[in-house]
Amino acid sequence: MPHLLHLDSSADLATSRSRAVTAAFADTWRARGEEYTVTHRDLHRDPLPHFADAEQHWPAAARRPGANPPAEQDALTATLHAEVLAADVVLVGAPLYNYTVPSTLKVWLDHLHIPGVLAGEGSQPLAGRPAVVVSSRGATYDAGSPTEGWDHGVPVLRIVLGNSLGMDVHVVQTSATLADRLPEMAALKERGAAEFQAALAAARELARTL
């Protein structure tokens, strides 16, 4: 059966645009038929533990002699790997927090990026599998603007999911999400609303076709 792994990381449980867009994707996916199943992991409501030992970055065979990371954390890493390997599509809600991904999402990436297991040349069981990244950004980071290049969220996800894991990364983006809140951004309200609607439409289209 076609299976979706749906991850959210926004701390905003009421008005998050990344959550709204990932929900639109997941709802459209389910609407394709009963066989289209979903596993939802909320990284904010149920945060993962940071690595307790640096050797957790490595598979057991590559760890230093005497290394003994907590067994329960190795078991959690194995569970997270099983979740992503079971998915035909991975959906990642990734709001931009202080110019990068939320720390809760970064921990998930750390658990996934284990050289020789899911990541690295010759060990990419997820190669070619679609990953849909929903990026919501409070401001704008247009080419040629003073803030060009300040978004360090999407590049991280492209490198880890795309380059290291070999996944086929699709990015759905909505900007100016703070225009309704900050008076100094009022001129961007119309743009923010239009980008949000476009992101919803793009997510639904991907959910129908992937």
Curated annotation (Swiss-Prot):
> How many cofactors are bound and how?
Binds 1 FMN per subunit.
GO terms of molecular function: electron transfer activity; FMN binding; oxidoreductase activity, acting on NAD(P)H as acceptor; oxidoreductase activity, acting on NAD(P)H, quinone or similar compound as acceptor
Q: Coiled-coil annotation: which residues?
A: none
Cysteine-cysteine disulfides = none
Required co-factor(s) are: FMN
Q: Which UniProt keywords apply?
A: Flavoprotein, FMN, NAD, Oxidoreductase
Ligand binding (FMN): 10, 16-18
InterPro entries the UniProt entry points to: Flavodoxin_fold, Flavoprotein-like_sf, FMN-dep_NADH:Q_OxRdtase_AzoR1, NADH:quinone_OxRdtase_FMN_depd
Catalytic activity field: 2 a quinone + NADH + H(+) = 2 a 1,4-benzosemiquinone + NAD(+); N,N-dimethyl-1,4-phenylenediamine + anthranilate + 2 NAD(+) = 2-(4-dimethylaminophenyl)diazenylbenzoate + 2 NADH + 2 H(+)
Q: What is its EC number?
A: 1.6.5.-, 1.7.1.17
Q: What exactly does this protein do?
A: Quinone reductase that provides resistance to thiol-specific stress caused by electrophilic quinones. Also exhibits azoreductase activity. Catalyzes the reductive cleavage of the azo bond in aromatic azo compounds to the corresponding amines.
The entry describes its oligomerization and partners as: Homodimer.
Name the family the entry cites. Belongs to the azoreductase type 1 family.
By what name is this protein known? FMN-dependent NADH:quinone oxidoreductase
Gene of this entry:
azoR
